[in-house]
Structures are given as C-alpha cells and as structure tokens.
Amino acid sequence: MRKYAECAAIKLDSFGDWTAFVLTERGRPDIAPTVKHLPHKAARLLHHLRQRGASVPLCTSPWDRDRIHRATLRGSHQSAKADIDFVCQEMLEFCEQGFWTVLPLSIALRLPHLRLSPLGVVPQRNRRPRLIVDYTYSGVNDDTVKLAPPEAMQFGKALQRLLSRIVRANPRYGPVYLGKIDIADGFYRIGLQPRDIPRLGVILPTTQGEPLVALPLALPMGWVESPPYFTSVTETACDLLNARLRHWQEVPPHPLEDLAATPPTAVASPPGKWMPDTPAFGDSAPLHSPPLAYGDVYVDDFIMAAQTRRHRRRVLRAALHSIDQVIRPLAADDRPSRKDPVSVKKLRQGDAFWATQKTILGWDLDTRAGTLTLPPHRLSRLYELLDAFPATRKRAPLAEWYQLLGELRSMAAALPGARGLFSTLQDVLKRKANSRVRLSRRVFDSLTDFRAIADSLRNRPTRFRELIPVGDPIAVGACDASQRGMGGVWFAAGLPPLVWRSEFPPAIQRSLVTSDNRTGTISISDLELAGTIAHKDVLAHALPCVAERPIWLAGDNRASLAWATKGSATSTTARAYLLRLNALHQRRFRYVPQHDYIAGKANVMADDASRRWDLSDAALLTHFNSSYPQDSLWTLQPLPNAMRSAVIGSLSRQRSIPASLRIDTTPLPVPGGSGNGSAPPSASARICTTSRATTFPFSCSSRNGTDPAPLPLATSPFDLARWRTPSVTWRRRSPGWGPRTLA
C-alpha cells in the first residue's frame, strides 16, 4: 500500500493537476453515455452525474492544519486497526479498480478543503468484511448540504410493494415466481466531482512511517448522500424495467440470460409446516387481470416477480436491458478490473433463478404457502441477542441497546405480535445516564415475550395477508370511551348491527386524569386505546373468522389511533401494557386492522354506547332502534369476560393476558386452505365501505372558503364510510420520479 501511495504521488506530480489525475485514475464513467436521451424525468440528473460527478458541498469552513493533525492522531476505528492487512489488501484492490486513490499525508495536505474521517471494518455473513467510513464522527455528514434527490430512495417500502403484488396476483396463472439481480460494485459506479474529493478523505491505519490518506474517486460507503445519488440510478433503471412491461414491448435476448438460469447450489426447503394445499389468494385479484410481471429494487438489489414462463422471460430480459441503459455494459477497451454492471458471481450462485421459495431482502418468502419467515441465521441471531441480556444483568451500554432495538425492529415483520413489545424497550432510552441504560423487570418481561414468540416461529410463520390488506373490510365500526365506560358499534355482512359496552370499575374511574384529579395515572387516551382493543375483540368473537381479512374502525381520539396503528409508544404506563395486549390479540386472530379518525360530534353511536349508563341494556337497544334504525334490529353483543379482565389489568399495569392469547407453538389454521379453517367471506358478502366524502368536508357555499360545513352524524355504515381513508396498493413512484435539484 505504501509503495502504491508513493507511485500515486509521483503520478500526481507529473500531471500537475488534481482533476486530470482523478479522471485518469477513475477511467471512463460507468453511467451509460446515452442516459440523457432516456424517457425519464431523471435523465438530466444522470447525465450531470456522468459528466461532472456528485458534488460534496459543505456548510462549514475548511479545516485548519490543527484539526487535520488531531484527526490524524485519532486515526481509524479499532475494527480497522485490528485488521490492517485486510484493509490494505482491500484498499489496494479498490485503487486498481479506480474507486480510490491513496497518497502520503504530506502530499494530501496540498489539496484544498482536505478533511479526514476514520475508517471502520464491518463484518458480513458469508462474505468478506466491508470497509465503511465514519463520516458522522468527523462531522462531514452533518455539514453536508443535501442536494441529492431524496425522493429517489423508494426502497423503504420495497417489501410491502412486493407482497402487495403477490397477494393480488391472479391465481388463474399459477404461483408467483421470484428472482434477484445484484449490481456489482454498487456505490462505486457513481463518480465524485474531483474538486470535492478531498472533503471525503480517510485516514488509513498504519503501523509505521508517514500516515496514508485514502481519497474516494466514487461514492463512498458511509457518506450521507451516497444512497440517494446511487438510487437515482437504480430506481431509474427499475422505472424503465416496469415501463417495458407495462407497454408490452418486445424485449430481445440478453447475453447474460443463459447464465441467469443457473439453479442455486442448494434448493431452499419449505419454511414451515403451516402450508395449505392451494394458495389462499382466491379473491384477491379480478379474474380479468393479466399475469403478474413486476420489478422493484432495494438500493442495488433488483427484485423480479412473474407468473407464467413467458412473463418470467420478459421480466428477466427487461431487467437486464434496463440496467444496461443506465450503467454501461463491459466494453473491449475497459480496464481488466472492471466488472459487468450485473453481478456475474451472484448469477452463478442462482440468485436470478426463478423459484417460489426465495430469500428476498433478508426474508424467506414462500409464494405458494403465502408465508414470510426469518432465515435460520437471522433466527439464530435473534436468540443471540436475547441471550446477551440475562435477567441478572442490570445495565447495558447505550450503543448495545440501540443495536438490540434496531435488529429487533428489523425482524418484527416476521414476528407476529412483536410490534406491541417495544414500548418498554424504547422507554429505557429516556432514562439513560453516562451512555448506559438501566434494565428493569419490565424490560426483561418484554424480552421474555420476544423469546416466546421466537420459540413459536416454526409453527407460526407470518402470512402475507397478515401484513397486506386485500379487498374491502369485512366489517366497519366505531368505538369510544369515557370515564364511566367504553363501547362501540359494528356492521358486518351476515350479522345484525351490533352494539356493545362495558363499564369501568370504580378504581379505574378514580385513576383518570381530569381537571379535578391531576394526580391520576390513566389518561383519557389510555381509556380510548382500551376501548379500541375491546372493540376488536367483540368482532373477533361475533364473526366465525376474521383471519387475514381487513376490518375498519373509527375513533375520535387521535393519540390512541396513532398508538394502535404504530403498535408502540415510548412509555411504561398503562398504554404500554395495552399495546402489548393489542399486539397479542392481533397475533391470535390475525385480522388486518385499519384505523381512521372520526370527529367527536359525528361519532354519536359510539358516544351513546360508552356514555348512556342511565339506560339499562334493554333501554339502550330501544334507544338505538329508534334513534339509529337499520335494516335489522340492533343486537347487544357482550364483551367477553376474559378480555374485560385483561383490559382492566392492563390499565392497572398488570401483565394479565387471557389464556387464548398466550403465545404457544400450536399451528393455526389457514383460511381458504384444505379444510383447516373457515373460508373468508366472499366478495358478494362484503358490506358497502365506499368513501363518499372527504374526511373533513368544506362547504362550497359558505361565505368563507375555510369554514367547515356542518358535520353529518354517523348513524349508519354508509355514514361511517365517509370517514374511511381508501386503502390503495403500495406502488412505486412510476412512471418516473423527478429530482427537485440538478446536483
């Protein structure tokens, strides 16, 4: 490495110009020369990146020699110092490929705007470690003026978009097949503007001699603007891919097409025993819809989904050609170290081979069974995380706690019921001291719940339709809570209109925070959240099957709706216990809840159910039949005693859970499977849930255009549907997103 740095210094002196030196070392741009002619809004940005590179504007003054000296003395992270041989070997390969260059510190100091950040080494599973720069520690990330288009980063919902396409695929054309294509060398495909490169300098670990400085010639790992700049390229390619598929363009063969058909060395086994004989997606797509042909991308991982053999071939060809449109393929005059844009190594490993069982974005997907599970290595990692926090442990470093929360959050989608267990774990961060957190009994109770969920995963994988709402809700309702009690109404096909209510015990009523009782321990929002949970339990026991079906409910308390939707709140109060109860209830019954706000003045039916305690049960039914008449008479549905006890216990901060909701390893039946459960209601049995007005309508005839029109009272399912936010399919920003700035 030192010999290379000395040669690079000599070459720089011979050029006498930093820009000429960079362009020579980097070679031809990887972005295709024809990008400016692409039928896409981002064409101008990509052409700019090809011609000039990504800029690195900073909002602070250049570093002086003293600060550079302090950064040099500080050096790299311990992870890099502990593996100097690997760092030198890896950096030397990067220099040969034109991604980095290395200079002695004395030469690098001549470059204007030089800054030095520490280098780290991150281990990776089944791959060699990765070099990453800590630009946050040096302040470069905070000082960077954000010019890259943030709307290019669509990868946050890639999994939801893919699952949404799968569950809505037309079953007439068979199961959905999946494939992957990886971009080789990732961020290093996008060059930097030569004059800005010294701002991203890196101090390398050395054992002796003059310190060495590494300078990135392309987007480095760790810089805050690298993801949006790079995804502006890959997302454009993905848009071109889907445009080809939408317009039914004929796609010619691709040179890598045969290599992409290489089967994997090991065929994945079914992720669990819970597998129906036939797909359970029978009513999720119109019978006239064409076979699925879709592509998406997560940073540099292209995901392909298709049904028939013909469409699988079209999607594969379209993906390969679309990538070539934005990242030029290999040319005869390229340097020997340059790789094809598509990772040939991954193709040989079978990544692009079409299969119904595939590891996608760190999840094992089975499109025949319609399930999502944690791969074995991630499940082992989950146990490793939990084992690191035995009940005898009293404190933990803050960094370790953040790592635990981050990894548990990343696994929560495949852990049914896990979303409601984060409230206590997050609350620990509010009480941190001296970069350490204190671990309490409540924390270990939550970790025990996580372990119980992990133990049940073999027989309890997550169904796609537990995550993606499909079709109209099978029931609509509204609920409310007051100091005296809680109640609500439900409308569902095949059932009479239901009203329910339950009175809070005096101890709960006395604990409510009011203007006269400021020392209370329960807020009205907590009671509203309790009512929401009880409301769903009433429906779950009234209908024969709610599994994997959307249900819609409205409430007039925004805080409780937000907690129920998110699944957690940073707290150890009653709401933490309620959210745990809410998550385990959804885990048990597997419905897909949709929560919406309704104005308090319009929520009259739920108000009466929760407040009219001057009426007996019979008088309440008479009141509803006369005030809110429906096609059939109202029925008073009781709240099961087990749920009432659990709600009161949670409000009292007790971990009381009904036996039916406890985490076990018993396989659950599959709706629509081979006799293992009740079939979901047919499309013809759905109730009308079409939204006929906006959530907050304004009067067109009012003297002031901002004056709200009088809110209509919600006295029927049609009135409630006015407040429903329509559920739409997760979609990409197609046919194209456009940057707000040039670069």
Functional labels for PLM-detected ranges:
Residues 139-149, 190-191, 257-335, 366-372, ...:
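Catalytic palm subdomain of template-directed nucleic-acid polymerases
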Residues 468-524, 538, 544:
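RNase H-like nuclease fold core
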Residues 674-743:
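Charge-rich, intrinsically disordered N-terminal extensions
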Residues 306, 536-604:
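RNase H catalytic domain
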Residues 122-123, 212-217, 296-297, 327-415, ...:
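A conserved non-catalytic segment of reverse transcriptases
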Residues 210-233, 494-530, 559-576:
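A short, polar/acidic, helix/strand-boundary loop motif
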